[in-house]
Amino acid sequence: MVGPGLGINRVRRKGVYSTKKGSGDNLLLMKRQGKHDIHDRESDDLSGHDAFSPSKKRGKIDSITEDEIEVKKLSTVATFDKLSRSFPNSEVQAAKNAALRGKEKEEEKVVSIPLIQNLKNEDIESIKCRNNNLLDGKKLLLEAELSAVEDNQIFSSSFPEDKKLSLQSCLSSKEQIIKKLQVREEYMSKFKLPPMLFSDELLTEVEPFMPIVMDILEGKISSVYYFEAKNAFKNSQKAYLSVDEFRKLNLNKFTAGFYGLKRQLRVGEEIAKRYKRALTHNQPATLKWWGITDFCNYVLAPETLTSFCIYQLNLSNKSCSSKTPNKHPKQQLNEKEYYYDPELRMLAYDLLEDTVEYGIIVADSDPIEQWEAAIEEDRLRELKLDVHNYSSRRWRLDTHD
C-alpha cells in the first residue's frame, strides 16, 4: 500500500524498511522508528498514517527521552537535522532540549555510583600480607598437630586422673620447688638414678646408641614404643595423628621415664636430622601416620634412651642373663647383642615407666642448658631458699663424686 503523496513501498519485518525513492529523510526516520519497534512491540499495530504523523514522531522522541533510553549521538544528530526540514524550529528545539535533559540525568546517575576501577598498591600489599599470615597460621597449626607440643594442657591431659602430672610443676614457685626436692630425694633413694645431663652432654653420650634407629626401621629389633605407636595408628580413623588424638594418648607409654620429655625431644630432634633420608624413603604406614617429627620424638628417641639407660645404670648387674658376663660397660658399648638383649631392655622399660613422674617434675624443671643453671640459682635466692640444698647443681656434683 502506498501512502498519500509519498510513493513508498513499505516492507516491514522487524523494523527493516525499503523505499523506491531512496528519500534520506524518510529512510532515517523509518530506521529509527523500526529500532524503537523492536524494543516496544506496541507500535506493531500502528497504521501507516500514524507512523508518519508529525505528532506521533514527536511523541515517540519524547517517550524515548522520558524513559531515558540511550540514543547514539550520531543517529540523534542526523535525525534531528532531518526533522528540522519538516518540523517548526520551536518543536525541533524542544525535542533537542528534552533529549539533552535526559542525557544529563543519565550522566548524573552514572556519576553518583562510586566504582572502584582497581585496588591501590597499599591495599594489594595489605591483602597479600594477610593471606601470608593465614597460610603461616595454617602451617603452624599443621606442625603443632604433627609435632611434639610443649603445652601444659596436652601433657596434663595425657596422664591418668589418679596420676595427673602437669608441667605447671616446673614453674618456680616456692611450693613447687619444695615439692620437687621431695620427689627427687624419693626417687634417687629408690632407683639410684643418674644425674641430669645438659643437652649438649646428653647428645654426645647417646650418639653411639643411635644406630638402633636403622635397626628399628629395618625390622631387625622389636620395639615396645613402636608397638604402642602402631596400636595408636590402627585404632585411629584418621589419615594422620591429629591434635585431638594426640591429647588422648597416654604419654606414659611414649616417655623415656626419668630423662624427661624435654631431653627426650632434644634426642628426637637430633635423630630427625641425622636420619632424614632414611625416614623420608619407604615409610611404613605407622611412620606416615605419626609423621617424622613425632615418630622420632615418641618412638625412636625413647628407644635410643632405653639403650643409654642400660649403659648408664649398668643393668646387666641386675639381670640373670648369661649373655652378660662381668664386662665393663665401655667394652660392651658397640655390642648390639648386649643392648638388644630382650631381658635387659625389659628391665630398662620397667624402670623408665616407673620414673615418669620424676622425669616430668624433676628432669623437665632442671636446667637443660648450662647457662640456665645461674638463672635457677638466682630464683632460689629470690625465694630465700637454700641454694646448695635446692639447686640441681648439688645433685650433679654429689652423683659424680
Curated annotation (Swiss-Prot):
Principal localisation: cytoplasm
Coiled coil: none
Superkingdom of this protein's organism: Eukaryota
Places the protein is found: Cytoplasm; Nucleus
InterPro entries cross-referenced by the UniProt entry: RTC4, RTC4_C
Further remarks about this protein from its record: Present with 799 molecules/cell in log phase SD medium.
Protein name: Restriction of telomere capping protein 4
Gene for this chain: RTC4
